[in-house]
Amino acid sequence: MVKAPQSEERLAGGGKGNNSVLACGAQASWSIFGADAAEVPGTRSHSRQEAAMPHIPEDEEPPGEPQAAQSPAGQDPATTGISCSPPTIILTGDASSPEGETDKNPVNRAHSPHRRLSHRHLKVSTASLTSVDPAGHVIDLVNDQLPDISISEEDKKKNLALLEEAKLVSERFLTRRGRKSRSSPGESSPAVSPNLSPGASPASSQSNSLTVPTPPGLDVCSGPPSPLPGAPPQKGDEAEVPSPHLGESNVLKGLADRKQNDQRTLSQGRLTARSPTVEKSKEITIEQKENFDPLQRPEAIPKGPASGPGSGGKMALNSPQPGPVESELGKPLAKTAKEGNPLPRGPTQGSGGVAPQASQGKSTVGEPAGSKVGSKAELWPPTSRPPLLRGVSWDSGPEEPGPRLQKVLAKLPLAEEEKRFTGKAGSKLAKAPGLKDFQIQVQPVRMQKLTKLREEHILLRNQNLVGLKLPELSEAAEQEKGHPSELSSAIEEEESKGGLDVMPNISDVLLRKLRVHKSLPGSAPPLTEKEVENVFVQLSLAFRNDSYTLESRINQAERERNLTEENTEKELENFKASITSSASLWHHCEHRETYQKLLEDIAVLHRLAARLSSRAEMVGAVRQEKRMSKATEVMMQYVENLKRTYEKDHAELMEFKKLANQNSSRSCGPSEDGVPRTARSMSLSLGKNMPRRRVSVAVVPKFNILNLPGQSPSSSPIPSLPALSESSNGKGNPPVSSALPALLENGKTNGDPDCEASASVPTPSCLEGISQEAKARMEEEAYNKGYQEGLKKTKELQGLREEEEEQKSESPEEPEEVAETEEEEKEQRSSKLEELVHFLQVMYPKLCQHWQVIWMMAAAMLVLTVVLGLYGSHNSCVEQADGSLGKSTCSAAQRDSWWSSGLQHEQPTEQ
């Protein structure tokens, strides 16, 4: 039996309310409790040199001694000096059992970067793990002493570095959302817990500064622990103390029931949330290490409500309690243990910002340890919850109170807190034995949210159908106050619903967004053409959308107006009836006068209600007319812009057409064959033989003919004619050149008034000025064009007359001209032959190489034909002489002419 020597000092130091973990030495002391506060059976204290995690026996026997009372209460909370003893490890279990012995040489064991995971909880509790050493001896790994392993200092340092690195990696990995914790309730059985890897050295156990719930009589004292790398600073020690008040029989019953429940849940494959018990509080530290969140800030961890007499027998060490409360703490604990009321237990924090209890049970320690299924319901704190349940329970709002709610609950009286959690959380969470029940429990919360959303949608739809009375009045009042650009949220909501608006899509909000809520020619800034176009597009869409539902909205508005009038009349009639029914009570003459006055007021109210309805309708119509007038102003401005651009483009197009005609008529002189053409034939054949000309030569100098905005008004169409004459073809024609001085004179005479008229126009952007100026120019250009064509015709006629006179004067020289024409024909034929030869040379280039050979062959063929002809004619004459008895009919001419021999040969045969 080992005494706990610092129990009074622990309570005295913890009673100050300091949220800090007191530590002495280099190692955090692990206090695994479950027996009395003063005496703990079956424990053994270890020195600092061992510095190892304790070995928990596989099968635990319940303590055979009755549990003693709590530590005395009336202690001074103002004690500042705290004397710390060497770190002690307090274990549960019977001292006589051989399984309670720990290993004597834990420091020399091999170091593993991961926690040792064994599946002993899946086997029978009596089975043990065995191994064979190098000597061949069988060793019980659970109960026997393990052989020493010699490890050098360098290996130890490497193992320590690997341990630290593995801790960091595992903590980062386990804090990921959706990661299923290895220490989830379904994997570690409370009856058989896995063995822990021992600490390697005091340095390694310094980083494992975790505190667990301790009884009030025990002391947790260690040096200032160095937290894990990446862990937040220490928040405080809020370990709560369950006060044991049960006997041996309850503990036995609890262990048996709990083993049965665990085996049942493991066989079913469910995740079961268990309440912490006295014998298996070592599992709390395991789950605490697995669920440690290095990224969790201590400010985000809500503190649990301060516990007191009604908090289920849990008393915080760091909160001072008055003496009477501590002395009378056993009575309410016994009551809650008997009644089995599930009460809340706030999450307590460890030294590194970790809640040391992985499962906050609703059932207290005062209950039997195996309090059936109801004891397994628990309220997970936000940080100590496994990632699986943490991911599942996003929607479990009532089951998991937030930080604000817990702060409020901490200020509430304990009775109200007990009622609240008994009514709400107790009724729901006490019935959730496993994950399936937890999911079933979450479903009603989601269904409630869905029903709430449906109700909200129904309300919104009803509001859209019904609407509010005269929604424009508040808007008008706001405009009268001088804040037309600022809208309240209520007005925007009313106009966005648009239930009773005559034109809901074209509202004041839309006009304000388009910046046309004021009259355009007045105070509003002028819009550009692009902005006007955008506004016009949006307004046209709004008009089109409103036209689809206009009839139905009118009928709906009239029906609602009639209903409102009928309701007002009914209310007034009821009021009048109630007053007339009480006429017997008006006995005094003054009362009678008041009665008559009330009746008159009711009649006035009738008339005012009717007038109000009609006036409201008129106000709505006028306001809508004002709104539509603003929209139509924008549309009219857009139409004017379109008209202006159309006229400008049309005038430019006509001017370019005229320039093209002038250029074509100037470039088209007399035809290439020398035959003069009339103006009509020339106009008909413009597109056929008109020579091509580059646009930059003929058209570009003419862009300043029309006085467009931004151009000099002094430019006139006629002074640009010299450019045309200079840029015309190189074929200078005498008629055209002779016609130019008259044209230039006409341009000077007719162009001056036009220049004066164009200069007198003040603003080129004015639409009427541009149209009149364009018309005047068109008329002048048509006149100039007709005059020019007349000059051309006269010159052509003069040329024709001159040509006829020349032909008459040249008539005696006709034979010479005929000879000349014959020579020209011959030259043309020779030129044709040359062209043929050239064509042959191009088509058949190899033919030119053998040209001489071809000529020689042709000459030889010609000679042969001549020789053959002569020889044939001579033979024909000789045959006729022989056949006609010596009479020769061939004359000398026939002998010479060999081609006539055939004819002469046929004549005697005919005779």
Swiss-Prot record:
Subcellular location: Sarcoplasmic reticulum; Cytoplasm, Perinuclear region; Membrane
Transmembrane feature ranges: 853-873
Gene Ontology annotations for the cellular component aspect, listed alphabetically: membrane; perinuclear region of cytoplasm; sarcoplasmic reticulum
Biased composition (Low complexity): 708-728
Start-end of Acidic residues biased regions: 802-825
Effect of S393A: No change in the inhibition of calcium release and no change in phosphorylation efficiency. No more calcium release inhibition
Keywords, sorted A to Z: Coiled coil, Cytoplasm, Membrane, Phosphoprotein, Sarcoplasmic reticulum, Transmembrane, Transmembrane helix
One Pfam family hit: MRVI1
Residue ranges of the region described as Disordered: 1-21, 39-122, 174-405, 478-498, 706-766, 787-829
Keyword field contains Ligase: no
Keyword match Glycoprotein: no
Coiled-coil ranges from the UniProt annotation: 547-645
Composition skew (Basic residues), residue ranges: 111-122
Subunit comment: Interacts with PRKG1/cGKI-beta and ITPR1/IP3R type I. Part of cGMP kinase signaling complex at least composed of ACTA2/alpha-actin, CNN1/calponin H1, PLN/phospholamban, PRKG1 and ITPR1. Interacts with HCN4; regulates HCN4 channel activity.
Function: Plays a role as NO/PRKG1-dependent regulator of IP3-induced calcium release; its phosphorylation by PRKG1 inhibits bradykinin and IP3-induced calcium release from intracellular stores. Recruits PRKG1 to the endoplasmic reticulum and may mediate the assembly of PRKG1 and ITPR1 in a macrocomplex. Involved in PRKG1 signaling cascade leading to inhibition of platelet activation and aggregation. Also mediates NO-dependent inhibition of calcium signaling in gastrointestinal smooth muscle contributing to NO-dependent relaxation.
Protein name listed in UniProt: Inositol 1,4,5-triphosphate receptor associated 1
Gene: IRAG1
